[in-house]
Amino acid sequence: MSWIEKILNKSNITSSRKANIPEGVWTKCDSCGQVLYRAELERNLEVCPKCDHHMRISARRRLETFLDTGSTTELGSELEPKDILKFRDSKKYKDRIAAAQKQTHEKDALVVMKGTLKEMPVVAASFEFAFMGGSMASVVGARFVRAVEQALEDNCPLICFSASGGARMQEALMSLMQMAKTSAALAKMQERGLPYISVMTDPTMGGVSASLAMLGDINVAEPKALIGFAGPRVIEQTVREKLPAGFQRSEFLLEKGAIDMIVRRPEMRDELAELLAKLTQYDLAKDEDELLGEEMIADDIESSDNEPEINIETNKKEDV
C-alpha cells in the first residue's frame, strides 16, 4: 500500500451528493461550446451572448416576439397536410407528418399571423425548421398565399422568415408547384405596391430560396445564415473545385450583392419597423409619442389615485 492510499482510507471517503439541478436549466452553444443559462438565452432570442451565434428558434416564438404583444391573430391554422400520393420511403409519409406534429406541436412547417409591428399593421409568416426541415409542401404554399391575400385585404406589408431545406419530396410535383404558386401571389403584392420583406435565416435552401425567399423588395438575412439552392458539398462534388471560405453564408452573399442587409435577431424588430415605416410613409415616431403619452397619463392617474385625501373641514377648524 502506498503512502497516499494510507492517508486516503477508502472506507472513510463518502460519496458526494449530486447537485439537484432541474433538467434544461443550462445548455451549450453549438458554435463556441460555452455553457449558457437557458433563461438568459431565451431573453436574448436564442442568440449566444458569448459569440453571437444565432441558434434555431421556433416559428411561433419568433412571430410572438417580433409582433406587438396581444395583437396577433393566426391565419390558416385549419389547413392540415394530407398524404394524397400514399408516399412511402423508409417510412410512411403520414407517419412522418404525425411524428413532426408531435415534436413541434404545429400542423405544418409554416406559421402565419397578422398583427401590428410598433402599431403598424402587418402580416408575418415564419418557417418551422423542426417540422421536416421546414420543407415546402401544399399546406405551406396555401398558408403563404393566405398571408398574401390578407396583406392585400388589409393593404399592409408582408414579412416572411425563411428556414427551410427546400421542397418536400414526399409530395413530389405538388410540392414543386408551390414555387410558382407563391411567386404568382407575390406578383400581386408588387402590382399593388405593397412592401414584401424576406428574412432569410439559417438555413434557407432549395425551392424556398429559388422562389419566395429571394423575391423580397428588401432581402434581409441573419448573421452567418446558410443560403443557396444546392448545398456546398453537392457543389464541390459537381464542379470538383474547392469553394471559397464562407461560401453561401450571408456575409458572402452581402459582399456579392445577392442580399441587401444583415440584421442581428435582437435588432430585427426595430430595423424592420423603420424600413417599413419609410416604405409605407408611416409616421412611426408619432405612434411612439402617442403610446408614450398614454403611458404617462396612465401613470399620472395611478399616482393621483394613491395620493391621500385632504379633509378640508378639518383644516379649516385647525386654522381657526
UniProtKB/Swiss-Prot annotation:
Keywords: ATP-binding, Cytoplasm, Fatty acid biosynthesis, Fatty acid metabolism, Lipid biosynthesis, Lipid metabolism, Metal-binding, Nucleotide-binding, Transferase, Zinc, Zinc-finger. The keyword Lipid biosynthesis applies. Residues 295-320 are annotated as: Disordered. GO terms for molecular function: acetyl-CoA carboxylase activity; ATP binding; carboxyl- or carbamoyltransferase activity; zinc ion binding. Residues 25-294 form the CoA carboxyltransferase N-terminal domain. Its cofactor is Zn(2+). GO terms for cellular component: acetate CoA-transferase complex. The keyword Nuclease does not apply. Zn(2+) binds at C29, C32, C48, C51. It comes from the Bacteria. Its main location: cytoplasm. Disulfide bonds: none annotated. InterPro entries: AcCoA_carboxyl_beta (IPR034733), Acetyl_CoA_COase_Trfase_b_su (IPR000438), ClpP/crotonase-like_dom_sf (IPR029045), COA_CT_N (IPR011762), Znf-ACC (IPR041010). Pathway: Lipid metabolism; malonyl-CoA biosynthesis; malonyl-CoA from acetyl-CoA: step 1/1. A zinc finger (C4-type) spans 29-51. It catalyses: N(6)-carboxybiotinyl-L-lysyl-[protein] + acetyl-CoA = N(6)-biotinyl-L-lysyl-[protein] + malonyl-CoA. Its EC number is 2.1.3.15. One of its GO terms (biological process) is malonyl-CoA biosynthetic process. Residues 295-310 have a biased composition (Acidic residues). SUPFAM superfamilies: ClpP/crotonase (SSF52096). Belongs to the AccD/PCCB family. This is Acetyl-coenzyme A carboxylase carboxyl transferase subunit beta. The gene is accD.
